[in-house]
């Protein structure tokens, strides 16, 4: 049994390291887009309005209304990185949304706070949803912050999501979650 565990861990580590080598970090893309893309300077009320529209649209995730409502938030040319995917064209983002929409249900998104600095709104949110994968449905819950810049038409031209996929997704996936938790157990000290 120990040999099997060792082989499993070694294989998983090798695959993980290989994936890390072939997938570039998004940090340089974020830095470049953040400097290049200029939104409008925001007020407190505009930041709150951005958060309210964002949460309202994503509360329809998993319903027929979602793709249209979410699509209306975004400009044709944009930078969006949600930690798992990156897009620069609205059409590609909408296609991604269509796929997401087929896998989730019972979505609840709450706006915790909205603040801003110059042209960036920082939207702090909580999202809970049921996620279908491999024929099973799992309830997920995560917190995150989205940095959002908008243009004069109030469309999102820049969005960088900061959230913890380990807690919000990886640990909850069938098969993968168990292996992830075994290799990197959650540590809690009170």
Positions of predicted regions on the chain:
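Short, low-complexity N-terminal intrinsically disordered segments enriched in polar/charged residues
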Residues: 20-68, 72, 190
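A solvent-exposed, acidic/Ser-Thr-rich amphipathic alpha-helical stretch
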Residues: 67-72, 76-118
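General structural signal for alpha-helix termini and helix-helix connectors
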Residues: 60, 79-80, 132
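A beta-strand edge to alpha-helix "cap/lid" segment located at domain peripheries
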Residues: 21-39, 102-108, 112-190
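Bacterial N-terminal signal peptides that target proteins for export
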Residues: 1-8
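Hydrophobic alpha-helical core bundles mediating ligand binding, dimerization, or RNAP-core interactions
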Residues: 51-58, 74, 97, 127, ...
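C-terminal motif of bacterial Sec signal peptides marking the signal peptidase cleavage site
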Residues: 15-19
